[in-house]
Amino acid sequence: MSKRESAKYKIDRRIGENIWGRPKSPVNRREYGPGQHGQRRKGKLSDYGVQLCAKQKLKGFYGDISEKQFRKIYQEAVRRRGDTGENLIGLLESRLDAIVYRSKFVPTIFASRQFINHGHVNVNGRRTNIQSYRCKPGDVIEIRERSKQLLLVLEATQLNERDVPDYIEADHSKMKATFVRIPAFSDVPYAVQMEPNLVVEFYSR
């Protein structure tokens, strides 16, 4: 397991919110960040601080995407027609790692990235090991036959802490999902409030 995966709950602690809605999140037990200085009272954030926090929260939710990669996704959202914030969410939710996670084939976004990297996932019948692969509406995502009985997968499909969103059709009996459509921001079931408009403001400074 990578340092990034083992530190997944540190993202919750750093941000101060249970961004995935998981029962074991440390912020369910305390309201301060990690480290020896975590208990210090936070002052009021500046506009920049609020925007930065919104960006870090959104980046964190999708597996703590690197700044370089996240900025690249944002720049594509800007180039597309329509609202940049809506485009940003649509691009993030179209990633293969997000769809495997949303389909409840794995328990966490970090597990999704590792699962894809290890070659357990097919897209339209072909093995795909690129976690950032962008799916299109109509694409069929399937757990490979040799991987369907992995305990990680079987346990994830039984999780009650989240549901499969309606822009994905998941068949857990066949370990297969179809990406129905690119969602609007209002369709995406985040456990905490996300503010893509503030992310746009951050990069527009």
Curated annotation (Swiss-Prot):
<keyword id="KW-0687">Ribonucleoprotein</keyword>
<feature type="region of interest" description="Disordered">
    <location>
        <begin position="20"/>
        <end position="44"/>
    </location>
</feature>
<comment type="similarity">
    <text>Belongs to the universal ribosomal protein uS4 family.</text>
</comment>
<dbReference type="InterPro" id="IPR005709">
    <property type="entry name" value="Ribosomal_uS4_bac-type"/>
</dbReference>
<comment type="subunit">
    <text>Part of the 30S ribosomal subunit. Contacts protein S5. The interaction surface between S4 and S5 is involved in control of translational fidelity.</text>
</comment>
<dbReference type="GO" id="GO:0015935">
    <property type="term" value="C:small ribosomal subunit"/>
</dbReference>
<comment type="function">
    <text>One of the primary rRNA binding proteins, it binds directly to 16S rRNA where it nucleates assembly of the body of the 30S subunit.</text>
</comment>
<feature type="domain" description="S4 RNA-binding">
    <location>
        <begin position="94"/>
        <end position="154"/>
    </location>
</feature>
<dbReference type="InterPro" id="IPR022801">
    <property type="entry name" value="Ribosomal_uS4"/>
</dbReference>
<dbReference type="Pfam" id="PF01479">
    <property type="entry name" value="S4"/>
</dbReference>
<dbReference type="GO" id="GO:0006412">
    <property type="term" value="P:translation"/>
</dbReference>
<dbReference type="GO" id="GO:0042274">
    <property type="term" value="P:ribosomal small subunit biogenesis"/>
</dbReference>
<dbReference type="GO" id="GO:0003735">
    <property type="term" value="F:structural constituent of ribosome"/>
</dbReference>
<dbReference type="InterPro" id="IPR018079">
    <property type="entry name" value="Ribosomal_uS4_CS"/>
</dbReference>
<keyword id="KW-0689">Ribosomal protein</keyword>
<dbReference type="InterPro" id="IPR002942">
    <property type="entry name" value="S4_RNA-bd"/>
</dbReference>
<dbReference type="Pfam" id="PF00163">
    <property type="entry name" value="Ribosomal_S4"/>
</dbReference>
<keyword id="KW-0694">RNA-binding</keyword>
<dbReference type="GO" id="GO:0019843">
    <property type="term" value="F:rRNA binding"/>
</dbReference>
<dbReference type="InterPro" id="IPR001912">
    <property type="entry name" value="Ribosomal_uS4_N"/>
</dbReference>
<keyword id="KW-0699">rRNA-binding</keyword>
<protein>
    <recommendedName>
        <fullName>Small ribosomal subunit protein uS4</fullName>
    </recommendedName>
</protein>
<dbReference type="InterPro" id="IPR036986">
    <property type="entry name" value="S4_RNA-bd_sf"/>
</dbReference>
<comment type="function">
    <text>With S5 and S12 plays an important role in translational accuracy.</text>
</comment>
